[in-house]
Amino acid sequence: MSFTDDHDHAACQRPLERVRPFDAAAFERAVADMLTASGIAIDPIHTGKTAQRVRELWQKRLLDGYDTVPAEALGSGFADERRDMVVIRSLAVHGMCPHHLLPFRGVAHVAYLPGGRLHGFGRIARMVDAISHRYTYQEWITHEIARTLVEHGEARGAACLIEAEQLCLLMGENRRGDERVITQCYAGDFETDAEARNQFLRAIER
């Protein structure tokens, strides 16, 4: 997997945390200013409600992950002695690249090896949303999903593979438009158990 220079963020592993509350009024003013700076007049027919619409989309769908702690979204699950691998294929996932403020979207394949607790599938999906609906990178999301299942979900191991379309890549110069980025992370027993990794990869094959 290769990235442009803009994706040279391997040395920085800290999430981009929110340092103050979302300011809806300031956000709408910024969108209106961007339209004006682009040379576009704000008129009642086409752009009069654009600032409000953009703010609602960003606040409610693109950045709503900041309103939820991933571990709380996952919850504690329930006690269960089963140890067989649990795999969820093709969870919708999207995030916002902080470099160009362009979204990326794709699917996340998630697996975990229970360590005494099972977790609801909806809970896992909400955890993925809490992790990804932020200013973030695909690599960080992949790592954080696996890490959260092990550290907070008490899983013996966890795996995550994400395949996504990165608009900052797709819209670059001389691109074909069908590029995809694949990232994967293995935590806990998955790191040392090659058979578990292979079983996971077989399970998510289309």
Swiss-Prot record:
Pathway note: Cofactor biosynthesis; 7,8-dihydroneopterin triphosphate biosynthesis; 7,8-dihydroneopterin triphosphate from GTP: step 1/1
Keywords associated with the record: GTP-binding, Hydrolase, Metal-binding, Nucleotide-binding, One-carbon metabolism, Zinc
Residues binding Zn(2+): C97, H100, C168
E.C. code: 3.5.4.16
Superkingdom assignment: Bacteria
UniProt feature coiled coil, ranges: none
Uppermost EC category: hydrolase
SUPFAM superfamilies, sorted: Tetrahydrobiopterin biosynthesis enzymes-like
A GO biological process held by the record: one-carbon metabolic process
Catalytic activity: GTP + H2O = 7,8-dihydroneopterin 3'-triphosphate + formate + H(+)
Single GO cellular component term: cytoplasm
InterPro entries on file: GTP-CH-I_C/QueF, GTP_CycHdrlase_I, GTP_CycHdrlase_I_CS, GTP_CycHdrlase_I_dom
Subunit comment: Toroid-shaped homodecamer, composed of two pentamers of five dimers.
PANTHER family per UniProt: GTP CYCLOHYDROLASE 1, GTP CYCLOHYDROLASE I
UniProt record similarity statement: Belongs to the GTP cyclohydrolase I family.
Name assigned to this protein: GTP cyclohydrolase 1
Organism: Chromobacterium violaceum (strain ATCC 12472 / DSM 30191 / JCM 1249 / CCUG 213 / NBRC 12614 / NCIMB 9131 / NCTC 9757 / MK)
Organism lineage string: Bacteria, Pseudomonadati, Pseudomonadota, Betaproteobacteria, Neisseriales
Gene: folE
